[in-house]
Amino acid sequence: MTEHKRRATPPYHQDPDVTALESLPARQQQVLQATVHHYVDTIEPVGSKTLVQRFGLKASAATVRSAMGALEQRGLLTQPHTSAGRVPSPQGYRHYVDCLLPPPGSAAQHLERELTNLSLRWAALDDLMWQLARRLTDFTGLMSLITRPARPKPTLQAVRLVRSGDRLLVMLVESSNQASHLNLRLPHEASNELEAIEEWTRDQLATTGNGSLDWSSLPPQLNLSGSLLREAIHSHSQAQTPAESDAVFHGMSRLLAQPEFSSSASLQPLLELMDTQPAAVVPVGSEQLGGVWIGAEHPKSALEACSVVQAPYHSSGEGIGQVALVGPMRMAYATAKAAVSSVANHLERLLC
């Protein structure tokens, strides 16, 4: 599946799916939760007898087996081999995270105390990010990533064009209440198109509502001025993009040691992403939100075998940064969510 076809809407900022929870019988909820916990702990498919014995389920093995079959029909469990037990599917993990996640427990409180006792008040931001990333990896056993605070990228709200001889002054009005000025050479052939191209941009921005221009709908008679304007806006946008070096990550070796990443075919795209675009772990458009991406929910195909748990932190006057954990879909989600939230809150207290 190509990346541009992947789901772009963050799946995790919505309220828990109450309808799905109510439609899943209590027995199946209990069995799904137990199956997830067993698989996270053991990396082994599980059968009904083991679930009854280990988790003290008040039901016979036959009843639990029936519930597991129903969960498999719903797509929440899967059976890797005919003779094997069952494991959670990506959809099963999603339902678990949305509806069945337990409290994080005492481990998260231990991390809070540990962070409070760290002497980081006067540390430089780079040192602060590195130390907290290492602590996060040591605590969870997952790869951690922390990005520098950055203001949300402004969106385009209006385009104004002013001709001055053979030059064209382009004023870009952005959502940050700032205006950028671009000075371009104006071909003589395009001088009569300015009023029409400005009107076209105005209509486009009103239609899309998100600061984007659909250049594929540009009338053919405006191609000359449109090409000039498109290139100028693109160059300006690229210049505003934060550098990828504004992210630090730690614990790649922990991630690669997981059985899910024993195949080089699944490993190479992930290594390339972390080498060239580590900040892409946090999907564009989710900067102010916190939550969980599971498998193919993430817009980057390199992370389709992973889960990403993230939490934002705010820095006074600097914008928004991110704390994230990357691991296999088989992870302790309650602990991971509590851990990124603790580190994000600690960063806010230190930076504000």
From Swiss-Prot:
GO molecular function per UniProt: DNA binding
Domain of life: Bacteria
GO BP annotations, alphabetical order: negative regulation of DNA-templated transcription
Keyword flag Transmembrane helix: no
Pfam families: HrcA (PF01628)
Entry-linked Gene3D superfamilies: 3.30.450.40, Winged helix-like DNA-binding domain superfamily/Winged helix DNA-binding domain
Keywords per UniProt: Repressor, Stress response, Transcription, Transcription regulation
Family statement drawn from the similarity comment of this UniProt entry: Belongs to the HrcA family.
Role noted for this protein: Negative regulator of class I heat shock genes (grpE-dnaK-dnaJ and groELS operons). Prevents heat-shock induction of these operons.
Protein's name in the database: Heat-inducible transcription repressor HrcA
Gene label: hrcA
